[in-house]
Regions:
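Structured alpha-helical segments in the cores of large, soluble enzyme domains
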Residues: 1-7, 100-105
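Rossmann-fold NAD(P)-binding glycine/threonine-rich loop
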Residues: 2-13, 22-50, 55-66
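A short hydrophobic/small-residue beta-strand
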Residues: 17-18
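Rossmann-like NAD(P)H-binding beta-loop-alpha module
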Residues: 39-42, 48-114, 124-125, 133
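Substrate-binding/catalytic subdomain of NAD(P)-dependent oxidoreductase enzymes
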Residues: 99, 103-172
Length: 172
């Protein structure tokens, strides 16, 4: 968040921004609007945020191209969390798995599959951010989430006692 708030200033100064930071594009509508406005400066600075959704897949570029060529986006489907996909593939009591959920989350974190703080994945915040980013690329939806990702309803998998734990090491 601390760097993302400077993106409009960077853009107004003529610098392009390349970032995997979801927070800049899924947070407050004010910051999102300021970034969009700054992109219109005479110097035409560029913003590359492709890896904010879909890691290395060209999800954002494809969606932008579809919109730019006049296609109407009716729905977007996909697995929006590789972390949750991994965790649920590993945690399968029906298949006889005896590994604790917390151990699977810990392994996922050690392997670099989770966000820096796994609570972002387990709370639903990471998916809510990605949904917000995608919706803001679609005309008619761009300004529908005034509180950003906080406007998206989620259901957390985090136990109540850990929900506010800021230290990722303690959380896991």
């Amino acid at each position: 968040d601390s760097v993302a708030c400077f993106y409009p200033s960077f853009l107004h100064a003529g610098f392009s921004v390349v970032t995997p930071n979801k927070k800049a594009f899924s947070g407050s509508l004010d910051l999102f609007s300021a970034i969009e406005e700054a992109k219109q400066d005479d110097s035409k600075p560029l913003v590359y945020q492709e890896s904010t959704v879909g890691a290395g897949l060209p999800i954002i570029g494809t969606l932008k191209d579809l919109v730019a060529t006049g296609d109407k986006i009716k729905k977007v489907e996909g697995v929006l969390s590789g972390t949750m996909s991994y965790i649920f593939n590993e945690f399968s009591p029906a298949a006889g798995s005896t590994t604790k959920f917390s151990e699977i989350v810990s392994v996922a974190r050690q392997n670099g599959y989770t966000e820096p703080h796994p609570g972002d994945d387990l709370s639903g915040s990471d998916v809510a951010r990605k949904l917000t980013i995608l919706s803001r690329l679609i005309p008619g939806l761009a300004y529908e989430l005034p509180r950003g990702f906080a406007s998206v309803s989620t259901q957390s998998l985090t136990p109540a006692g850990l929900a506010d734990e800021a230290n990722a090491d303690v959380y896991v």
